[in-house]
Amino acid sequence: MIKGINHITYSVSNIAKSIEFYRDILGADILVEGETSAYFNLGGIWLALNEEKNIPRSEIKYSYTHIAFTISDNDFEDWYIWLKENEVNILEGRDRDIRDKKSIYFTDLDGHKLELHTGSLEDRLSYYKEAKPHMNFYI
């Protein structure tokens, strides 16, 4: 039986710059740092970065694949300003209903998509039950 997410690993092109991004911009606690790898605690998630310099990264921008982190609604504007001030690549978000709460989509230095989201799974399911009658719900 799967008990939960163990860790998330991202391949990065420059470990030193990526450490700065996750530590200084997102506030991750660095746990381990090596020549080509680093481990963080980011909101209770074990995040691993491994440097792989010579792999193609150009197609990643076309994918919706991302990791979303929970933030409070009260912190939403502060996060947006913080990311802008630090010249983080903020992406145009998708159109969303107010019941779907708020999100900021952005990328790390290698184009991995990240999201800061004010809603919860319960919020999303409540909204979808109202707005998407074609969906089947099992909870």
Curated annotation (Swiss-Prot):
Q: Keyword set for this entry?
A: Antibiotic resistance, Cytoplasm, Magnesium, Metal-binding, Plasmid, Transferase
* Bilayer-crossing regions: none
EC assignment: the record states: 2.5.1.-
Q: In what residue span(s) does the VOC domain sit?
A: 4-119
Localization terms from the record: Cytoplasm
Q: What would you give as a GO molecular function for this chain, any one?
A: transferase activity, transferring alkyl or aryl (other than methyl) groups
The record's annotation in InterPro entries points to: Fosfomycin_Res_Enzymes (IPR051332), Glyas_Bleomycin-R_OHBP_Dase (IPR029068), Glyas_Fos-R_dOase_dom (IPR004360), Metallothiol_Trafse_FosB (IPR022858), VOC (IPR037523)
Which Gene Ontology cellular-component terms appear in the entry? cytoplasm
Provide the residue positions that the database annotates as binding Mg(2+). H7, H66, E115
Q: Which GO terms describe its biological process?
A: response to antibiotic
Q: Which cofactor does it need?
A: Mg(2+)
Pfam families membership: Glyoxalase (PF00903)
Catalytic machinery residues? E115 (proton donor/acceptor)
User: Carries keyword Nucleotidyltransferase?
Assistant: no
The signal peptide annotation in the UniProt record is: none
Q: What interactions and quaternary structure are annotated?
A: Homodimer.
**What does the record give as the function of this protein?**
Metallothiol transferase which confers resistance to fosfomycin by catalyzing the addition of a thiol cofactor to fosfomycin. L-cysteine is probably the physiological thiol donor.
- NCBIfam families, per the entry: Fos_BSH, Fos_BSH_Saur, PRK04101.1
Family per similarity comment: Belongs to the fosfomycin resistance protein family. FosB subfamily.
Q: Which HAMAP family match?
A: FosB
What is the name of this protein? Answer: Metallothiol transferase FosB
Give the species: Staphylococcus epidermidis
Q: Which gene underlies this protein?
A: fosB
